[in-house]
Amino acid sequence: MTALIFDCDGVLADTERYGHLPAFNATFEQFGLKTRWSEEEYGEKLKIGGGKERMASLFDDPAFAREVTGDRSELVATWHKTKTAIFKQLVADGKLPPRPGIPRIIGEALERGWTVAVASTSAESSVRAVLSHAVGDATAARIPVFAGDIVPAKKPDPAIYQLTVDRLGLEKADTLVIEDSRNGLLAAAGAGLRCLVTVNGYTKDEDFAEAVLVVSELGDPGRPPIEVLANRGAARPGPYLVLDDLRACLEGGTVENGGGR
């Protein structure tokens, strides 16, 4: 049976620019911290896997470390809890619509009997909120979510994808990961899985040499045609991706050349 594993942030919705970044900055303000990340600075922080880890990186600045005292683990945990609540409110307020093609592809995949899952090292409650907003509560209830600190290491470590495959009993040869970043791609490839990448503003210039297909978005009927940035598989995309394109991404190739088998 074919399986699709979706990353959350930047894949289900454009959460980084319009959700996580403002939530981080609102948290910093709420706790009286002077830090405010610009879009460019946050783009650099995205190279660090995990929200708590990004917050912890503030202490790499000696001036910040001198000003902010206390147990760093406790501080970061408190900040991150607040940031997660702010982020979830942004989702509830409708600030983060799904990326094109997400509701359509997920709905059609479930109708065809494919397994659909979400694997992310973001906070589980945030991931579930984004998923429910993207596809609706009824559809989201049919989709297993593996997220948060369920694994000890963040992407690019492959642990989250290996766990998802093991828990669901998936065949790697029949499983396609949909990611948006190089860290996510490396995590998928490290787990021996083929990966389709839908880029976003933060990741469009990253190296996706291991991806079987790289596109601007999944696309939808009535929208401008998608841009195919790289195609190392058997898919022959039209103006938007369909399930047959995703299935074709699993045909032939190896992990090293963008395949996955």
Located regions from the model:
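N-terminal helical cap/lid subdomain that shapes the substrate entry/recognition surface
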Residues: 2-100, 107, 111-112
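Conserved G/P- and acidic residue-centered "switch" motifs that form tight phosphate/ATP-binding loops
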Residues: 7, 11, 120, 180
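Residue-level signature of catalytic and energy-coupling elements of molecular machines
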Residues: 24, 120, 188
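Asp-based, Mg2+/Mn2+-dependent phosphohydrolase catalytic module
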Residues: 107, 123-261
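A structural preference for short, pocket-lining loop segments at secondary-structure junctions
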Residues: 114-115, 120
